[in-house]
């Protein structure tokens, strides 16, 4: 494959959709500049092939000057979809984020027609288009919107209709939709991971034309477990034979994959394309079917191109589980759309940075292609497997005691809205067609002059209607009192039938309708006698309407041989309390849905069994009653059935500590095994539950549920110490290098040096958690991180964002970071990466190899202070859901405007830097110390804090031979700080801060003493 990325950006730096016509001569593109670009595709492909063979300056100049041959301007917002009609060279559809859909025909002067919104609904709400597709016969256009609905547009009959009205579920955004190549199915993928499969067909109507009919046949909800919602687009694709559907951004057990659903295998997942770690948002099948050998139809395969937000393009062969070609970091920005030329030899894709890329394949590089006749035969083979529209699928069969199947629900074009007629005619025709669907044909030889209100949208709201005062009918009806009863009964019958319709209608003057000849089996209703029918060998008594029990029979003939009872149970006279909220509201709603919506069913099981999950935990830690009333009570980890730890001193990950818990007694002890790959090195058996484990530089340590610590040699498994008994279950077990740290559930803190086998410190974390409160025992902040450094210094972070270290010399906890610094310091890094400019890396989410384990937290490239400040950022964002901007806004509004608070931010910034420097001294962070110290001195020089500068310089200078005024305890002065020579730091400060005029007098004074400045006098 030869790959070319055009050097310049198009559409104001964002191309969101591209497509190619049938003869590969035109490429259309749309993006952020609200324009549609029309490209000469032949010239584009020829130029891309020329670059790969003759990369001359003339060719590169042609590339830089390459532009669309013309632009079409009709949209007023971002264009997110452009699609050519199948097999067409001139006509295509475009849509934008404002919900507009346009029809285009390419000529010298392109013709454009707005399909949606049309006049009769332009006053209603129009929602942004999410995705759009065109049927294989170029008759139907379907698009989804961000309110969870899918709409159909018939370009032949100019009708418009909502498809999702037959789903009867809470609207969920359908992120991608696609018609199949065989013109039988429409598939949609929602943000709730559910895939809806619609089947449709055409049937002749009374006007010798055909109308479509849709039906929801499958709901696939167990294909994948997660669905990333942060993707801008998700574009699914059908295989050219109509058998496979590729679903991107699927996730199963934290693994990103592309799922292939097979239509011939009853819509099951037959293949998952895995084998790489990057995300995939857009997929596109090659329009050709390939084989490994020429004209060999026994082993065929398709080719898929996939791309997404990770800037990676992959080419897949459906017969293989791994990609055949991967272009990593090929472009800058997300890959938003992919298209193939119709001959399958060129691949084009666009990015969010406005780049257009082309990949050209050599003949037979992807495989041997088949002729058009063979391709049609493949499609016909799939069409032979299509079930009729009235077919009952297995999940729709009767289960248990259900004797009668519910009716199949169809969406008929008879109920669609015409886009060419006026609003009143549209509603009138809609009402007439709706009445035909329920089997009622209202006839009259005269017209009724009834005045009603036009309803253009929304749901009909029931209201109390007073007894109608009917106007006299024209001709053919007598004016006696019996006719009044006849008219009243007719109106009631009409109202009851109208209420069964889903779309609002307007009662206009009905035109005279020719008499309809009913079937020989047509029976007229008698309102004075209940009707008895026989169905499936059982007598059915039709209920009689009370309001029409004494009315005269209607003259209106019925078109159905058996009149169905009026079923209108959506409104009830009783009200019920909602079920207990211990049951999910979504559960009992879905439990009441009709059987036709169930996606799974069984003829054998009357009651669905809950799927069994593997046992992850085998119990909880039992606390001693004496310690359960402690002032500090920390949570303890649950006891796991088994777990493994990979050795962090081994880069290959072949050494593993495997722990399998038994029954917690002598009859079945827990097993502790250290292995190299599958080979056992050493093992031990413990008659207790093992709770936690950690690894040091030369030891392994495990804890049991009763608070006992066992230590082993790293290599041989020899016991290093007798069992350490703490008496309380352990909440945190951490280690780094030669240090082992333990925090019990009652807040006791221990740190041991395992080389010399001595206790380094014993303290408690209660000062961090015991906050004063009048109400006594309250819930305090959670511990979010507990670790130990290479110097044996404990570190703790809390859920309020504060981070602490324990000073062994002072015997107290000291603050490293808190949210106050984020509140007003200029030097706070509020980014979420954990890496500030010029500093070491924290435990950011961008590096998958880093974890919050102590062993991997404090390596040479990482900064402890930046890590803890990153934890503060996480807690602030988690609690407030806002960034630093909101805090800064609070300062500017509430404090900076007040008298006496003008220097608030400068003061906070200086305090923040001073705290950083002091913590670096305690933690031994040499690299961070130099960076923070240099920044601090420059800042106090800039602000003119001469006293602070003098004190800093005096400390760095120390005692000198000529200075006899120093106090006698000056001999305690250390010449180095954090590995840096103090006087060298002083020289660096004098030279770097000399440009600040307010500090020059102080700097010159110390410069003379250290010999940097020569006194000419």
Swiss-Prot record:
Q: Known SMART domains for this protein?
A: WD40 (SM00320)
Kindly list the GO CC terms recorded for this protein: chromatin; HIR complex; nucleus
**Which UniProt keywords are present, listed alphabetically?**
Chromatin regulator, Nucleus, Repeat, Repressor, Transcription, Transcription regulation, WD repeat
Q: Where, subcellularly, is it found?
A: Nucleus
Cystine pairs annotated here are: none
| Segments of skewed composition (Acidic residues) | 473-483
Q: Which GO terms describe its biological process?
A: chromatin remodeling; DNA-templated transcription; hyphal growth; positive regulation of filamentous growth; regulation of DNA-templated transcription
Bias category Polar residues: which stretches? Answer: 518-535, 545-561
Q: Does the keyword Amino-acid biosynthesis apply?
A: no
Q: Where are the WD repeats?
A: 10-49, 74-117, 124-163, 167-208, 228-271, 275-326, 330-371
- Segments of this protein annotated with the region Disordered: 417-561
Q: Which family does it belong to?
A: Belongs to the WD repeat HIR1 family.
Function summary: Required for replication-independent chromatin assembly and for the periodic repression of histone gene transcription during the cell cycle.
Q: Which PANTHER family match?
A: MEMBER OF THE HIR1 FAMILY OF WD-REPEAT PROTEINS (PTHR13831), PROTEIN HIR2 (PTHR13831:SF1)
The name this protein carries in UniProt is Protein HIR2
**Phylogenetic classification of the source organism:** Eukaryota, Fungi, Dikarya, Ascomycota, Saccharomycotina
